Swiss-Prot record:
GO terms for cellular component: cytoplasm; plasma membrane. One of its GO terms (molecular function) is lipid binding. Keywords: ATP-binding, Cytoplasm, DNA replication, DNA-binding, Lipid-binding, Nucleotide-binding. This is Chromosomal replication initiator protein DnaA. Belongs to the DnaA family. PROSITE patterns: DNAA. It comes from Campylobacter jejuni (strain RM1221). The lineage of its organism: Bacteria, Pseudomonadati, Campylobacterota, Epsilonproteobacteria, Campylobacterales.
């Protein structure tokens, strides 16, 4: 059997949208294939990895059933040379697709924690059979940048595609440019047909629609038509509907007429889980020490964290060395300095003392009272996470003998956090207060 025929037969097993978005551009590589190895080329590395994970076993099974032979399936990114040979028709086909989703943004790859479980639950619930457009509609997810709003939005899109639904994903900028382009070309009917006839409309950063009244008017009518036809609408923003500047009251009212879910900065355990998930996806092996260092040294922007992980791997690969804690510190030093220069240990000490109703002089003393020791350890822990101070510098600040005393306190408070959920929550609360204050 011609292996290319496998994809055609597989097409019958999938929804039209799922096949078009993920497998239609997969090409059989006859030159690299052997009797027991079938190689397929995907448009890029990200798509290759996704198809290998999601469809590799299914393609192998399909091939064995229909040919009677077993084969290993290898999905790889096509080379630049092969890419240049792609026809203009293929490029036009890709551009014509109404949905451009990151295939790795799925519910399975989304790490759930206290900071995002409500938003996750609402989005996941509507992807169950017959729930789209009926259970929660619209869904409005808001929160600071880099916390997973786009991931969640596109997870709904990918799940909807697998259900055979027509999905439109667009940022506000995409929507505005699309409208402006069609207006200039006298093809607004095409614009209306695209957006009004979808099953699922996903709009990222909806706050930027507030640039002109005409854009908002168009979106208002599109919103109403999709909603009236039981289509699902999900939007993301940096603020809740009532705080959106430049957005008309009638749009704010419609945005709020459904589920409003916020995503807040993740707690430490969630950040660690996210880092592990990112490492797993990118096939990067980091020790627990490095993972904990990244989690406690960087802010809460997930894209930023993933960028550091990829940079670490690139450094190690190029230099031909192992990823060590020392390498991590070297790669991250400028980044951490930039983030931490506005936060001082005095700021941390002041806030912790206020929270525990303790004098700063007591925390800096040698007193061994339990509440003072705990407060001291929290200050040290937060100083390690939020400032660029080294252990010797912290030892000097607390007038301790040397940095080993600081290391001991860090170890003790880390153990306490792992065994005491309320303490962990309190420290996360203090950390967020310090970060907010430093940005004001």
């Amino acid at each position: 059997m011609n292996p290319s025929q496998i994809l055609e037969n597989l097409k019958k097993e999938l929804s039209e949208n799922e096949y078009e978005n993920y497998l239609s551009n997969l090409k059989f590589n006859e030159k690299q294939s052997k009797a027991d190895l079938l190689v397929f080329n995907a448009p890029n590395e990200l798509m290759a990895k996704f198809i290998q994970t999601k469809y590799g076993k299914k393609i192998a099974h399909f091939y064995e059933v229909q040919s009677g032979n077993k084969a290993i399936i290898n999905i790889q990114a096509q080379s630049a040379k092969q890419s240049n040979k792609s026809t203009k028709i293929d490029i036009a086909h890709i551009k014509a697709q109404s949905t451009i989703l990151n295939p790795s943004f799925t519910f399975d790859s989304f790490v759930v924690g206290d900071s995002n479980k409500y938003a996750y639950g609402a989005c996941k619930a509507i992807t169950h059979k017959d729930k789209l457009g009926k259970l929660y509609n619209p869904i409005f997810v808001y929160g600071p940048t880099g916390l997973g709003k786009t991931h969640l939005l596109q997870a709904v899109g990918n799940a909807s595609l697998e259900m055979g639904k027509k999905v439109i994903y667009a940022t506000s900028e995409n929507f505005i440019n699309d409208f402006t382009s069609n207006l200039k070309n006298g093809s607004l009917d095409k614009f209306h047909e695209k957006y009004r006839n979808c099953d699922v409309l996903l709009i990222d950063d909806v706050q930027f629609l507030g640039k002109t009244d005409k854009i908002q008017e168009e979106f208002f009518f599109i919103f109403n038509e999709i909603k009236n036809n039981d289509g699902q609408i999900i939007m993301t923003s940096d603020n809740p509907p009532n705080m959106l500047k430049g957005i008309t009251e009638r749009l704010k009212s419609r945005f709020a007429h459904g589920i409003i879910a916020d995503i807040t900065p993740p707690q430490l355990d969630t950040k660690i889980a996210i880092i592990r998930k990112k490492c797993e996806f990118n096939d990067i092996n980091l020790s627990n020490d490095i993972i904990n260092y990244i989690a406690t040294s960087l802010g809460d922007n997930i894209r930023e964290i993933e960028g550091i992980i990829i940079s670490l791997n690139a450094y190690a690969t190029i230099l031909g060395q192992e990823i060590t804690l020392e390498l991590a510190k070297s790669v991250m030093k400028d980044h951490i300095k930039e983030k931490k220069e506005n936060i001082t240990i005095d700021d941390i000490l002041s806030l912790v003392c206020k929270e525990f109703n303790i004098k700063p002089s007591d925390v800096k003393s040698n007193k061994k009272t339990q509440n003072i020791v705990t407060a001291r350890r929290i200050v040290i822990y937060l100083a390690r996470a939020l400032t660029a101070l080294t252990m010797p510098q912290l030892a000097n600040y607390f007038e301790m003998k040397d940095h080993t005393a600081i290391s001991h306190n860090v170890k003790k408070i880390t153990e306490m956090i792992e065994n005491d959920g309320s303490l962990k929550a309190k420290i996360e609360e203090l950390k967020n207060k310090i970060l907010v204050k430093s940005q004001s």
